[in-house]
């Protein structure tokens, strides 16, 4: 089936878009997306100093943002103004993204699962137009991720035993997360810098000692980050491997949830959920499902 041609008046030059056009990008997302990121969230995801994305298009009508990690390419955002959807701009943007990623050495393109700085863990199942676009370009559905929602008015009491990590713990936390969860390292450090990283430690733990061993009273047990890439969201969350299944993550999780409630949030959305049980125990329920799509480049 032939793709519809985009009218000349809606055929923008697919140029590089920079942080100076952040407000226009934000307004485009408001028109396009059911859960649009605000300017701060877009800036932190697309224009992070340590991992900037390549944003291409025209923020008045449509853009695509890409990133390369080794030989893997990722599309972090693709949106087209609803007024001109169906005229071929989405196809042009996706083709431009593939060309940019191929030029950067990518052998595959993935939509979703683009940690550490991401807006969505995939394509939400309600986004029929986006799913159709990807299928027409022969993208395969490779996995599903989901979020859970927690009503902060009904969470259990904070049991104590967790605190907000201090900036002075940077090196200890960096080493700890790099050893066990390297894919979450940058998100953890971003949360640390924002003051949104709850950690629990071995009894008598010193905030600066870190490490895995509790013999000296300083080992970290778990962490729970929130407000990392999107406001009102929870994650990543992790428990020291030797303590998995022993309830060691409850203190950090509940401390983070109570801090979110104190900050004025009515609900928390847990992103890209792994195990369901820890969040179900504090009232969480699955509320959104996202598909991850991938295509290998020729």
Tell where the protein language model's regions lie, with residue ranges:
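A conserved beta-strand-loop-helix scaffold within acyl/acetyltransferase catalytic domains
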Residues: 36-54, 62-72, 181-203, 216-241
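Conserved hydrophobic beta-strand within the GNAT/NAT acetyltransferase core sheet
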Residues: 75, 109-112, 234, 268-272
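Short amphipathic alpha-helix that is part of the acyltransferase structural core
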Residues: 2-42, 145-146, 155-185
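Intrinsically disordered, low-complexity terminal tails and inter-domain linkers enriched
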Residues: 3-10, 202-217
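Conserved acetyl-CoA-binding loop-helix of GNAT-fold acetyltransferases
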Residues: 86-99, 103, 239, 245-258, ...
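Acyl-donor-binding surface of acyltransferase catalytic domains
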Residues: 1-10, 94-160, 291-296
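A short, internal acetyl-CoA/4′-phosphopantetheine-binding micro-motif in the GNAT/acyltransferase core
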Residues: 75-85, 114-116, 237-245, 274
């Amino acid at each position: 089936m032939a793709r519809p041609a985009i009218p000349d008046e809606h055929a923008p030059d697919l140029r590089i878009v920079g942080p100076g056009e952040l407000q226009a990008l934000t307004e485009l997302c408001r028109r396009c997306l059911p859960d649009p990121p605000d300017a701060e969230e877009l800036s932190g995801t697309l224009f992070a100093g340590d991992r900037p994305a390549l944003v291409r298009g025209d923020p008045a009508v449509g853009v695509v943002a890409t990133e390369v990690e080794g030989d893997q390419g990722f599309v972090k955002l693709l949106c087209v103004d609803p007024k001109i959807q169906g005229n071929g701009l989405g196809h042009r943007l996706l083709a431009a993204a593939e060309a940019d990623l191929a030029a950067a050495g990518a052998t595959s393109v993935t939509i979703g699962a683009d940690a550490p700085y991401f807006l969505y863990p995939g394509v939400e199942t309600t986004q029929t137009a986006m799913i159709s676009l990807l299928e027409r370009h022969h993208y395969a559905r490779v996995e599903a991720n989901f979020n859970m929602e927690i009503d902060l008015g009904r969470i259990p009491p904070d049991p104590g035993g967790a605190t907000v990590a201090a900036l002075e713990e940077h090196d200890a936390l960096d080493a700890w997360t790099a050893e066990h969860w390297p894919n979450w390292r940058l998100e953890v450090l971003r949360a640390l810098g924002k003051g949104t990283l709850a950690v629990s430690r071995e009894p008598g733990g010193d905030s600066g000692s870190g490490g895995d061993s509790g013999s000296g009273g300083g080992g970290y047990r778990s962490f729970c980050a929130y407000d990392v890439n999107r406001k009102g969201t929870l994650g990543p969350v992790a428990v020291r491997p030797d303590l998995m299944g022993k309830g060691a993550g409850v203190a950090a999780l509940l401390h983070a949830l109570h801090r979110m409630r104190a900050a004025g949030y009515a609900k928390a959305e847990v992103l890209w959920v792994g195990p369901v049980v820890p969040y179900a125990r504090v009232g969480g329920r699955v509320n959104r499902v996202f598909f991850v799509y991938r295509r290998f480049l020729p």
